[in-house]
Structures are given as C-alpha cells and as structure tokens.
From Swiss-Prot:
Any matching Pfam family: Cys_Met_Meta_PP
Positions contributing to substrate binding: Y289
GO-annotated biological processes: transsulfuration
Protein biosynthesis is among the record's keywords: no
Protein name: Cystathionine gamma-synthase-like enzyme iboG1
Cofactors demanded by this protein: pyridoxal 5'-phosphate
Amino acid sequence: MAIYQVIPYGLPVPPNTPHAILVSLPTWNDTVTCIEGEDAETRLSGYPRFFIQVAIRKLASLMERKYGLDGERCMLFPSYRVAEQCRLFVQASFSGVRVVSLLVCQEDNKNARIVECKEDTGLSMQPASENHLHIVLFPTDALPVAKLFWQFTGTGISSRFADHWLSTLPDDVVRTNGISGSTSVQYLTNKSPGDYSVGLELTPLPDAASAKYVLRQRIAGALNVYDRQGGPYAVQENLQVGPNSHGIADVSENDVYLFPTGMCAIWNAHRLSLAVRSAEKSVCFGFVYCDTLKVLEKWGPGCHFFPEGNDYDIDQLEVILEQESARDSTKPPILALYTEFPSNPLLRSPNLPRLRALADKYDFLMVIDDTLGNFVNVDVLPYADIVVTSLSKIFSGSANVMGGSLVLNTNGHHYTALAAYMTAHYEDTYYDEDAICMEQNSRDLQQRIKIIDTNAEALCDFLRSHSVAAGAAKSVIKEVFYPKYKTPENYERCRKTVSNHNASLSSSNEVGGYGGLFSITFISNAASRAFYESLDCFRAPSLGTNFTLAVLYTILAHHDELEWAAQCGVEEGLVRVSVGMENTETLLKVFEVALSTAKKAVATA
C-alpha cells in the first residue's frame, strides 16, 4: 500500500516542490551511487550542503566564465567575511585562491549592471545583502577541499539567492556561451506531501525583517503555541506573547541568532567558543551527526570523542578533566562540550545534569543540539550555554528551505562574554526569501509535532514488539532505537511540560513526546535491504518532514568509514526513519508489509 508514488533516483523529494532539499534514494545501490558522487554534476536534486543545486551550478558557471581564469572553479557566498573564511580554508592546501566581490546595481525594472568591488572599499564591514555576491575562485584541483568547506560550514548561497541573481543579471553575463538556461525538472503527479498540514489560514507573507523577528520570537518560546487558526502571525501588529517555554525566564528574541543552515549555527557556535575562551580541545559527547565531529576536528585544537555518550563516558571524561586541570590550573581543561539531545542516529540522550555539573566545576561551555528533541518536546536550555538547532528539519517540515538557529542561555556563567561577542560580530547571512518561507512553514509547529509524535510512538511500539531485543527471537529486526527505549531516564529529565494558553480551551498541561525519529537494525544486510526497498514511503536523506522518510543512514553518512561506525554501534544496515503526519493505521500497514518482505528475503536467502 503506497503512501506516495516511488520517485526515481536523483529526482527531488517531495515532487512538485520548488527548492526541494531532498533527493530520492529508492534503493540500496542508489544510496551508494549518491554518496560516491559521480553523477553530482548532472543530478537534479540533493541536500544543499552536499549537492550544489541546479540554479547555483548555473550561476557558478556564469561567474567562472565571466571572472575566472582558465582552469579555475568557484564557490559562491552571500558575505565577504564568509568568502574570506573559505579562501583561508582552501589556501591551507592550495595556492592561487582569491575572492571576487560583485554588486548588482538595479538601474530600473528591466536593466541592471554588475560592479566589481575592490578590497579597499570596506567589504568586510558591509552587511550581507542579496545585491552582493562573493566568489571564491581556486584551481580545479582544489574543488574537493572547497566542497568540504561548503559542506561543513553550511555557509553557501541558497537556491533562492541564486534564482534572484539569475533573474537580475544583465544580458552580457547571461549570454555567455555554453551555459544552459534549463533548470526544469519533470515531476510526478501524485499527492504532494505539502497537503499534510493542519490547515492554517492563508495570510499575507511578511516582509523579511518581520519574518526574522517572529522566527526569533518563536524560537525563544515567546509566542503562544499555534493550536488554533487565527493565532498570531508575522504580519500582525501587537503580537500576543505567552510565557517563555524554555525554562529560562529572561531569554528573548535578542538572544536568538539565525543562520542559513543548522551546520552554519554549529560552526558559528564553535567559532564563538574559540573567540571568547581559551583555545583548548573540545569534547564531542555521544555519536553525533558526522559533520559536527568534523567541524570540531578541522577548526581549532581538535577534540576528545566519546561515542557512547553514557555515564561510563562521563566517568572517563572526568578523568581527562582532572588530569588537564592538574597539568595547568590557570585555564579550563577543555574549551566546550558538544552533544545532541537525543543523538543521531541512535537516539540516545546524555545525562545532562551530570555534564552540566562538570561544566560548572571545570568552567567549560556546554553546546547542545536539540534538533531531534525539538523545541516542543524537550527543555535543554537550562543545561546549556548555547543551544543550536537545524530549522531545516521539523521546524520547517516542508523540505523546501534551510535554516539554523543559535540561542544563548541568559543564566549561563559566560552569557555576558558570549552575548558581547555576538553583538559585535554576528552577521545576518540568512537570505530574506528563505526566512519568509521558514516563517510561513513553522506557524503550525506544535500541531505537526503532536501528530508526528503520536505516529512515531505507535510505529516504534509495533516494530519493537517484533524485535530480538524485545524477545522476538526469530524476528529479522534486531533492535529499535528510540528515546522511549534508549536512556529513557535521561530523556525524561528534560521532557517538556507544555502549558496550553489557548483562551478557547481549558487550561491544561501536555507532556512533550519522544520525537519523530527512530532507527532500526536488522539481523542481516539482506533483511535491511529488503525492508528499506519495500517501504512504501519516500526514501530520501534528512529528517523532520511532514511526510515519512526512510534512509540507509550509515551507508549515506559513513560510507568511507563503515568499520569505524560499526565499532561505535552504528551498523552498516541501519535504517533511519523520520515519521510524518500520515494516517497512523496507514503507516502501520506500510511498515507491516515491509517487515513481511524482509522476513521473506531472509527465509529465501
């Protein structure tokens, strides 16, 4: 029973969605093909940090031909300061890296001209703007290194930004020989996942400044939850505000900073830590998203890695802290500890009270990524100095825009220094049209999460009852990873009680759910492959969408380090599932069929 038509490999997910950030990976082999990247220059879609989207590729080709030397390639950025960071990163391995900065001057409704800006015009002091484009040019051999910067920092321009520039370029640039003007994609005609929403009233889109202001309010927990139509929107004046939902009384929109991607928020949190504290090693606590570890390793002195993220690892961490403090008591033993709540993909929750106690004792920063737990379900800010979130996931839900946020804990010991640095150095590079889209997508966040949490718990209870871990000895499912079953005592400590302030309803308290993400391991790769390829839902990377997604996570994220990942408990055949808003019974039937198919594959192997 198919929820949606199967989308062929390489096409956007969801279909009929401009600026889709996902790519269809319907089979095991397709996933391997995607990660090997040999078709990256011709594929039509992909996750924007790993894949240069079609509009961006077209604009980059135009810039290479117009401003590049023979044998040069380029990356495009919205800010001179970010472009300089890319130049420095690539220049560490290659010579001949340079930045060209452009300004588009719109002379009237039809005509524009491009002005090349000189370095002595104070570019580093100018705010990012859609009228500025910054090109990092480098030798072709340096392209893989430049792509790493694009991937790890999440600072590149978005497809909407590229479309804006393509629409305003003068004819002498657009008519460059050899550049195809076609960016069309043939979509399927099945039901769009965008239909899975809670039916918010159509309201006028806000201007970008209003959208960003309300996004920051929404993230800070200042706005009332949207549990009825007619709630506060960005375009309304005199917004009604409710109590902060983060457990920190003084956090406001002024303590929230927006970024173009979640990884950009993480990268900036690390740069912030390095700027205000002694540059010691960091700690990566738990098996977190792969690129978080890479950022900690590639910028600064490196990091200590504790893949299990359990109480034993906390004991081992404390040994290191004691040793480093004994060696030099004049400085903190580590710079900062980075962790996820819960972790991706094993959904383990660290013991935040113990970690916070160590942070207070040894004077290091705590940075918590709450993307999987999300604002509605968990309260982690009281334990953190900095909370980072990928807004591209459940906050948006529609898989058509990227975004990230960084929140400072006003009660943190280092808040004054952190806030002062951000006031002096924060640069808003979040493209206006992306912010407007994100604001619109996130208006019904609470209702969507409630539906998704209910669906995910029902699916996990069903699948776990058929797992070896739960006593089903002959099952093909080895284990289900979900916060309800993995380190539940740690998750429960931070599980949120949501106050309902809707005047049309009686006052009540609702407990946050366990989130919409879970992972499954199998007794063999044959079982994993059969289960994955027979799942009648979208099969694509990412998570937190309004529609159900599945992905072969380990193959996609750790293709070149499968043995190392397995040693950390992340098996090759792990299937990660992000649950959507579909009918619960329909989802149960879909997964029951996939389970039956996996059993048959093992029986006939």
